[in-house]
């Protein structure tokens, strides 16, 4: 009887194992956590700012998420690690790899989630995660018999439309929605350029009498310059649309385009550009453009 019971137990385990379906995740939760390895990646600077200095800034200024991925030369992902500001190993990732040539991708950003990194030629953020300043490292490396440490310098691949509302938020307006086309929410890591035609959406809760409010709209351009079609929509607390305004915005990679104006006064008028200038070239952004709407 003991033999029969043991046999039945083994058969039951085999049946359960055979019925269980493997879980295949495309949300990039399958991480590689290795304390020791032959390839160590350490972020040294982000857009010319030393990484230790960057992480000492407030959460609103610093990139609070890092992603490290290793691909073979055909683009198949082999390793993946996500890190958040405050993690003990924030800024350093270690992998154990056989000898060979690999593609290394590292990202720094402050999105509400991790991008999909299945394919290095289409790294994708989405509207629910939000779009933030994003920095990239991409390189092919050769792993041999000796362990090595790479010092990574990440560069900015985003463009920023900074939308400033000078007048006060009127009574009844509870939400502002910014919908923009012409850029991309995904990018090709080998180029740093956008790779799809996206409709990006950013939503902000607002309150009456708020003044000089600022809204940052990030995108990945398809080349070094481009333009966005931007639509701003105001809603009440019940989700009813109160009004909307549309405009075109010239954009350049690694530059800020400022849009300033009175959004809620004379909303039927056609927006015009008062002037444009490239100013304040610095180590953070290559330039800034100023317009009024």
Tell me the role of every PLM-derived stretch.
Residues 15-18:
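C-terminal motif of bacterial Sec signal peptides marking the signal peptidase cleavage site
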Residues 1-8:
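Bacterial N-terminal signal peptides that target proteins for export
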Residues 24-28, 32-59, 165-168:
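Short amphipathic, basic-aromatic surface patches that mediate peripheral association
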Residues 20-34, 268-293:
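Intrinsically disordered, low-complexity repeat and linker tracts
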Residues 60-118, 174-255, 287-293:
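Tryptophan-paired
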Residues 33-34, 151-158, 221-223:
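Conserved "repeat-terminator" motif of extracellular CCP/Sushi domains
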Residues 127-214:
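A sequence/structural signal for flexible, mid-protein segments enriched
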Residues 22, 84-89, 111-149, 238-267:
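Structured interaction patches on ligand/partner-binding surfaces of diverse proteins
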């Amino acid at each position: 009887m003991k033999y029969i019971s043991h046999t039945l137990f083994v058969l039951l385990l085999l049946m359960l194992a055979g019925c269980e379906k493997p879980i295949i995740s495309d949300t990039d939760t399958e991480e590689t956590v290795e304390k020791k390895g032959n390839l160590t990646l350490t972020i040294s600077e982000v857009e010319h700012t030393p990484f230790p200095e960057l992480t000492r800034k407030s959460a609103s200024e610093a990139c609070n998420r890092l992603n490290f991925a290793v691909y073979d030369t055909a683009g198949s992902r082999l390793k993946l690690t996500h890190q958040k500001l405050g993690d003990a190993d924030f800024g350093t990732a270690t992998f154990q790899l056989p000898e060979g040539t690999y593609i290394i991708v590292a990202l720094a950003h402050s999105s509400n989630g991790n991008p999909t990194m299945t394919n290095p030629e289409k790294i994708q953020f989405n509207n629910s995660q939000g779009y933030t300043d994003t920095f990239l490292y991409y390189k092919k490396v050769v792993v041999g018999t000796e362990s090595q440490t790479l010092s990574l310098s990440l560069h900015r691949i985003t463009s920023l439309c900074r939308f400033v509302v000078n007048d006060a938020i009127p009574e009844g307006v509870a939400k502002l929605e910014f919908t923009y086309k012409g850029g991309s929410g995904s990018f090709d890591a080998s180029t740093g350029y956008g790779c799809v035609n996206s409709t990006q959406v950013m939503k902000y809760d607002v309150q009456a009498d708020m003044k000089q409010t600022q809204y940052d709209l990030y995108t990945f351009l398809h080349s070094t310059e481009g333009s966005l079609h931007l639509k701003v929509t105001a809603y009440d607390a019940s989700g009813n649309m109160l009004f909307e305004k549309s405009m075109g915005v010239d954009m350049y990679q690694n530059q800020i385009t400022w849009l300033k104006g009175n959004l809620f006064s004379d909303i039927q008028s056609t927006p015009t550009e008062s002037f444009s200038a490239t100013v304040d070239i610095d180590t953070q952004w290559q330039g800034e453009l100023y317009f009024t709407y």
